[in-house]
Amino acid sequence: MLSGLIQRFEEEKMKHNQERVEELSLVRVDDTISQPPRYAPSAPMPSSMPTVALEILDKAMSNTTGATQTQKAEKAAFASYAEAFRDDVRLRQIKRHVNEQISPKLKSDLGGLKKKRAIIHMTLLIAAVVALLTSVCTLSSDMSVAFKLNGTSAEIPQWFKSLNPMLGVVNLGATFLMMVCAKSERSLNQQIDMIKKEVMKKQSYNDAVRMSFTEFSSVPLDGFELPLT
């Protein structure tokens, strides 16, 4: 019985050693997953939007600095088109919807500023006329100018000369009002020009998003047709 156990133990040991040798003799494979070979793209690459944006900006900057409002509006339109080419598709759509919501409000503000400027300009003209009349009256009374009527000379009455202090105050007030109106009108002109520029930028951006650049590719700017509203 003991000899049978010893023989069985020896057989198990030999079998275990043989399995161990077979396991060690196996070739190990790297654990990393093999990747397929990379091939260079053979399809023609579409025109890069950032490249087109840089070309548009170069076109805008190649001209001289805009001296008139029309030239400044032109450069703002160029910048908006370049921005539309540079932005991502989703960002373009977000900006387009925001511009459509803001543009009517900007136009309403622009109309209000123009009405305010017209009122201030009319006030400026009235103040200028008042200042001119009071200056002429004060100067005539101070120089004691005599007028000839039917061959007889008529001097300015004394009661009119007594109005010189009041006319001087009116002239001073009209002059001060002219200065205030002129300053306010300049400020309004700057605001109006700025709003006009913003309206031009937003309209140009939306036009760039909507339009299809057939001279660059047959695919619209956003990759799909947009309904023109």
From Swiss-Prot:
In the UniProt record, what gene is named as encoding this protein? Segment-10
Q: What is its main location?
A: host cell
Membrane-spanning residues: 119-139, 162-182
Coiled-coil positions = none
This protein's GO cellular component annotations are:
host cell Golgi apparatus; host cell plasma membrane; membrane
Species per Swiss-Prot/TrEMBL record: Bluetongue virus 17 (isolate USA)
The protein's topology relative to the membrane is:
Multi-pass membrane protein
Specify the protein name: Non-structural protein P8
| Annotated InterPro entries | Orbi_NS3
* Domain of life the protein comes from: Viruses
GO biological process annotations for this chain's record?
A: symbiont-mediated suppression of host innate immune response
Q: Which Pfam families match?
A: Orbi_NS3
Location in or out of the cell? Host cell membrane; Host Golgi apparatus
Similarity field: Belongs to the orbivirus NS3 family.
Give the keywords, sorted: Host cell membrane, Host Golgi apparatus, Host membrane, Host-virus interaction, Inhibition of host innate immune response by virus, Membrane, Transmembrane, Transmembrane helix, Viral immunoevasion
Q: Does the keyword Transmembrane apply?
A: yes
The record describes its quaternary structure and partners as: Forms homooligomers via coiled-coil motif. Interacts with host OPTN; this interaction inhibits innate immune response.
